[in-house]
């Protein structure tokens, strides 16, 4: 089987992009079991309840992410919601740890994807949005969509 190249998106966390203002993005590797990778190849995963924590030893963990059991797996299948270790350079972890010490900042998982056959997680240092900010962002998005629709309609008439 030829080696896989390029990137293939598995799952996105749309809720994170809505609830948080993204500051810095990072790419992290994931320490997974074989059945987890097979389940991800089938596109089965959810990041809606996922969050990232840093323990006392300075290791980052992806928690709350749901990777369902592999359908063809046997007794050695993985636990769907287990903690999964994120693989980053020590300096990146230190920078993120300093970032979340500031009030209102957190680390959120944005997406999971395959890159050259390996599972990667896109994570971000983010600041929580207030309800007003969320409504304003939605309004701006709708206005932009309506403007595009109006321009498209005007171009069709000529």
From Swiss-Prot:
**What's in the keyword line of the UniProt record?**
Cytoplasm, RNA-binding
One example GO MF annotation: RNA binding
Q: Which BP terms does GO give this entry?
A: trans-translation
Record-level GO cellular component terms: cytosol
Subcellular localization, as worded in the UniProt entry: Cytoplasm
Q: What is its main location?
A: cytoplasm
Question: Which family is it part of?
Answer: Belongs to the SmpB family.
Function summary: Required for rescue of stalled ribosomes mediated by trans-translation. Binds to transfer-messenger RNA (tmRNA), required for stable association of tmRNA with ribosomes. tmRNA and SmpB together mimic tRNA shape, replacing the anticodon stem-loop with SmpB. tmRNA is encoded by the ssrA gene; the 2 termini fold to resemble tRNA(Ala) and it encodes a 'tag peptide', a short internal open reading frame. During trans-translation Ala-aminoacylated tmRNA acts like a tRNA, entering the A-site of stalled ribosomes, displacing the stalled mRNA.
Q: Per its UniProt record, what PANTHER family does this chain match?
A: SSRA-BINDING PROTEIN, TMRNA-BINDING COMPONENT OF TRANS-TRANSLATION TAGGING COMPLEX
In Swiss-Prot or TrEMBL terms, this protein is called SsrA-binding protein
- The gene behind this protein is smpB
